[in-house]
Amino acid sequence: MKLDKESTVSLYIQLMHIIKEQIHNGTYLEGEQIPTEGELSKMYNISRITIRRAIEELCQQGYLKKIQGKGTFVEAPK
């Protein structure tokens, strides 16, 4: 999936939808570490601030869990 920079939908929301879809379709499995903010920034050519906002929202929704010094991991989809 690609981000549409011309869309009226915010980039962080588009990224959230992409990551959720990857969790649901098995690209990222429960307990698996997702790419770092820097890696995601390069993959999607968007700022780390945008990446961080999407990740924080997904953590609040229970899709991801950040572990200090280790990374961000997939939680069981609720």
Descriptions of predicted regions:
Residues 77-78:
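Conserved segment of winged-helix/HTH DNA-binding domains
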Residues 1-46, 60, 65:
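Extreme N-terminal segment that seeds HTH/winged-HTH DNA-binding domains in transcriptional regulators
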